[in-house]
Amino acid sequence: MENCIVQEITYIDEYIELCEIASKSNHPNASNYNVDKMKKRWNKYLIFTKLTRGNELISFAGIVDFGNNLVRVADRLYTKQEYRQNFMTKKVINPLRPAVDYIIPYHTQWAIDRGYDCFYSIQELKKRNSLIRTVKLLNPNLGYSVLPDLYATCNPKNPRCWQNIASTTKNIHLQSKPIL
């Protein structure tokens, strides 16, 4: 693993700076990091972290409480272009895997230490295989498994809210529907 550090963000000003970087990027979900929307979201985070190597930002994400002792880790995960896995191949090409090696393990351990069950999700059914691969790459002691259905991670009327989930528990209270 690279010499990287996960740091907790405690001030909204630094959080806003990170959102500005992501919202101006060519990230497929750049609009998710709209500064005004993210300012409103700040108080929903139990923690928000960034991954750096030296002074270089690599990735960031937060943990959101979903109620009933369940949290979403790696919420609004952003990774700089040069550290992203850009192709849906079976082989992980980039040796630095920010989510798998740093963000998800750090968030999960933080949450488990406080008695939470965890999940992370990925949009779109066509990306389900990449979720399965990330679970295989994670330390098995974290306890993640891919759940069989799609789950509403936000408003169930919005098709983008129905997502694939990997979780440390099979007891998910989110609305679900079978994959057709």
Residue ranges and their predicted role:
Residues M1-L18:
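A short beta-loop-alpha structural element at the N-terminal edge
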Residues E14-E17, I21, Y102, Y106:
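Alpha-helical elements of Rossmann-like donor-binding domains used by nucleotide-donor carbohydrate transfer enzymes
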Residues E20-Q81:
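A conserved beta-strand-loop-helix scaffold within acyl/acetyltransferase catalytic domains
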Residues L46, D113-Y116:
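Short, high-confidence coil segments that cap the C-terminus of an alpha-helix
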Residues Q85-Q109:
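Conserved acetyl-CoA-binding loop-helix of GNAT-fold acetyltransferases
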Residues Y120-R133:
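Conserved beta-strand-loop-alpha-helix junction that forms the acyl-donor binding cleft
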Residues I122-Q123, K136-N164:
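Conserved catalytic-core motifs of GNAT/GCN5-like acyltransferases
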